[in-house]
């Protein structure tokens, strides 16, 4: 009887912990306005005519949903020029990662001000923190370059972009349910600036202005509340170069490294192509000669194999962080570049060439393409087969 009562009390305690009320002081109107890029999409007329409180509720609501708290509610109010958030239906410590994000945002704001003082801030840039991410139940960390401006102005969703949408489909191809992919896509951009998608080159000189922000975010997000390391994936050449400059190890595409942003915590990092690189690599206009299309297809198939392997590693490590990173990577490259090359091919032709599934299957069964697939098996024998973008 006593044992049964004790179990019931334990269950009640866990239930209460999962359905607590969290109150958080966000700061002054001025602070919250800049950290939430308010207003997100107003010229003379606002695309969505939201108040500051509604904007904050929107992003905090995204976070609680992506953390898996389906019944959680967010309410934001202003009192004497200070904003406060009340979140119900979340664990008692839920405010801690949110507070850490906003504190890091202050560092980003300072960096942006220095950048502007040096005459390097562009008129069409906006400071944009990774709002709306999974905060408490994140499975892995994605290091990226910068968010496209339309994620802020049109979508008001950090995870709505061609880059993140494509990567989510690759995670799904590796067994992660679509509804759960946001937990794997907690993003840290080394340039916290919403800018036109073509602004990559323009942003190359800004990274050092945000060093305090970048390293703080990596330190805070790369470990769980219990102190365990989360797997990290570094997308694209600028980000992989940043990892080397900041932490030391060289990270090539499908190359593994370990960093220690916190004492005693070893974070596994996998290098990957930028998710959008495949559209450049597979563009026939980038090649010459009568076989330009064939060259583009071959390049695209290689990148698709690399990308599926990287997403496989991310999915596997995120769902079971105790796995050996190198063993997981070997298994993933074997899967997508040796065992399931036909499926790699089909995913390339359906998602990049936009062929119907039946046509993609026929294309991948043709003799010219089958010979190209053998090149995937060759590249799978080498770690870090290419540099990518």
Show the residue positions of the predicted features.
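N-terminal signal peptide c-region/cleavage motif recognized by signal peptidases
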Residues: 15-18
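C-terminal capping/extension of enzyme domains
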Residues: 22-81, 202-212, 244-388
């Amino acid at each position: 009887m006593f044992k049964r009562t004790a179990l019931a009390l334990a269950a009640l305690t866990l239930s209460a912990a999962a359905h607590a009320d969290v109150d958080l002081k966000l700061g002054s109107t001025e602070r919250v306005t800049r950290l939430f890029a308010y207003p997100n999409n107003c010229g003379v007329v606002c695309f969505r005519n939201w108040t500051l409180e509604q904007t904050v509720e929107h992003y905090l609501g995204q976070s609680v949903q992506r953390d898996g708290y389906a019944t959680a509610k967010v309410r934001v109010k202003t009192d004497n020029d200070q904003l406060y958030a009340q979140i119900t239906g979340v664990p008692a410590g839920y405010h801690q990662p949110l507070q850490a994000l906003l504190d890091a945002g202050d560092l980003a704001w300072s960096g942006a001000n220095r950048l502007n003082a040096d005459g390097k801030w562009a008129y069409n840039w906006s400071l944009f923190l990774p709002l709306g991410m999974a905060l408490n139940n994140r499975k892995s960390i994605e290091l990226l370059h910068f968010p496209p401006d339309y994620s802020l102005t049109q979508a008001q969703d950090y995870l709505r972009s061609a880059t993140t949408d494509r990567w989510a489909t690759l995670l799904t191809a590796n067994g992660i349910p679509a509804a759960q992919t946001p937990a794997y896509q907690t993003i840290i951009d080394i340039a916290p600036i919403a800018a036109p998608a073509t602004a990559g080159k323009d942003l190359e000189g800004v990274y050092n202005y945000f060093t305090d922000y970048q390293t703080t975010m990596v330190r805070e997000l790369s470990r769980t509340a219990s102190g365990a390391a989360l797997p990290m994936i570094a997308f694209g050449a600028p980000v992989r170069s940043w990892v080397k400059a900041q932490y030391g190890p060289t990270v090539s595409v499908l190359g593994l490294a370990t960093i220690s942003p916190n004492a005693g915590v070893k974070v596994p990092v996998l290098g990957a192509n930028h998710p959008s690189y495949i559209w450049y690599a597979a563009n026939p206009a980038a090649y010459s000669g009568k076989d330009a299309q064939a060259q583009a297809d071959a390049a695209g198939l290689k990148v698709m194999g690399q990308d599926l392997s990287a997403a496989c590693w991310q999915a596997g490590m995120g769902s079971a962080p105790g796995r050996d990173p190198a063993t997981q990577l070997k298994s993933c490259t074997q899967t997508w570049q040796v065992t399931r090359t036909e499926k790699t091919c089909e995913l390339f032709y359906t998602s990049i060439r936009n062929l119907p599934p039946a046509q993609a299957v026929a294309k991948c069964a043709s003799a010219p393409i089958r010979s190209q697939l053998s090149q995937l098996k060759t590249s799978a024998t080498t770690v870090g087969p290419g540099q990518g973008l």
